[in-house]
């Protein structure tokens, strides 16, 4: 396997890692139930997506 000829400096390593940060998910409020959910996904609380029922949720007994 290939090996580096020279050691990378701390500055060069840090510059490469500037893009490795975690990105917070974009959230939206569900117009059906008012809960927060991730964009372009089914609401976990009510099961609606874009105004239509996508997943039938069981009622809590």
UniProtKB/Swiss-Prot annotation:
This protein's GO CC annotations: cytosolic large ribosomal subunit
GO biological process: translation
Biased amino acid composition, Basic residues: 1-19
UniProt keyword annotations, A-Z: Ribonucleoprotein, Ribosomal protein
GO molecular function, one term: structural constituent of ribosome
Keyword Cell membrane tagged: no
Pfam families: Ribosomal_L32p (PF01783)
Region described as Disordered: 1-20
Chain ranges passing through the membrane: none
Disulfide bridge positions per record: none
HAMAP family listed in its UniProt record: Ribosomal_bL32
Family designation: Belongs to the bacterial ribosomal protein bL32 family.
Protein name per the record: Large ribosomal subunit protein bL32
Organism: Bacteroides thetaiotaomicron (strain ATCC 29148 / DSM 2079 / JCM 5827 / CCUG 10774 / NCTC 10582 / VPI-5482 / E50)
Taxonomic placement: Bacteria, Pseudomonadati, Bacteroidota, Bacteroidia, Bacteroidales
Gene giving rise to this polypeptide: rpmF
């Amino acid at each position: 396997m290939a090996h580096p000829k020279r050691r990378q400096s701390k500055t060069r390593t840090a510059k490469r890692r500037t893009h490795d940060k975690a990105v917070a998910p974009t959230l939206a409020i569900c117009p059906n139930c008012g809960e927060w959910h991730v964009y372009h996904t089914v609401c976990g609380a009510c099961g609606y997506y874009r105004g239509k029922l996508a997943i039938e949720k069981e009622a809590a007994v």
